[in-house]
Every structure is written in structure tokens, then in C-alpha cells.
């Protein structure tokens, strides 16, 4: 399991301002030990902040302030198991969710949504070397995904607007780069 981030924890209920730094995700025992070190037993009394992301730093602006330290640990545990392709999918899914929230004026992304996105990365198609609408359009045409274009003579392919085809396909599938 790879490490996702460094997190600083301190008890907001204790007069002792000493905190503890942990590398997440952590085990249940590491969490219990940290709670002992900051002199608290209640997760509601724990103030925490991410000091440094080792990966998934694009999540930082989307972390819900009401997320408990246990929810955050669970999220980082899910994230730590993702491979490079799945991490790319997670980034794309997050972009799509952010765009949906903006369109629908839904406010910030919730902890539950982040957990759902992380668990759905295997249901995404990640295309290597496709970084633009034009690349996507070429991919669709060259791989026969646009059956309406199969009847065209080879000489007509040079006249196609691949960027427009790619944009149409990306938008119809709610995709992201």
C-alpha cells in the first residue's frame, strides 16, 4: 500500500497544543496511538490538516472540512490501492464531478462522492496518448467506433474534422481529459 499524504493532527479540546504527524493511510492501531498522543478519545475533538500530498494532490481543494479523520483515512486507504491507470481515471472522474456540480450549482463535493469516485475507477476507459478532442476523434474513427463513417472512401478521411468528432463523442459520453 503506497502512502498518500502527511497529516498533522491535534486535539481541539486539549490545552496541550502538541500534535502528531502521520503518513496516511494508517492502521487502526496507529490511529489509536495518535489519539493517545494528542490526549483525546473523541474523533470530533481532532483537528487535522494535510501538510503534504505524495500523490492525488488535485484532491486538496475538494476535501470537505466536515470530513472526519476516520473518513479521510478510509479515503486514503482506497486511493493508496490505485495503480497509475486508476489514478488517471480518478482524476478524470473528479473533473467530471466538479463540472456536474458547477452546472447544477450543487456546492462542494462530499466525502461520500469522493469515496464513490475512488471505488468506480475500474469502470472507466483510460486512453493512452489521447489528450485532446482531435486525438479522441482520430481514435474513434481509426478504431471503427463511428460506424456512420465506415462507408467513406479512404481519401475522405483527410477531410474529416477530428476535433469536432472528438468533442461530440467526449460530450456525449461526459468524458474528460
Whereabouts are the PLM-identified features?
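Residues in flexible loops and secondary-structure boundaries
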Residues: 30-32, 58, 168
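Generic ordered-secondary-structure signal
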Residues: 14-16, 27, 98, 123, ...
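Acidic, proline/glycine-rich low-complexity IDRs
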Residues: 1-4, 137-177
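Mixed-charge (acidic/basic) macromolecular-recognition segments
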Residues: 35-152
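Alpha-helix initiation and N-capping motif
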Residues: 28-31, 133, 162
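N-terminal ordered "arm"
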Residues: 1-45
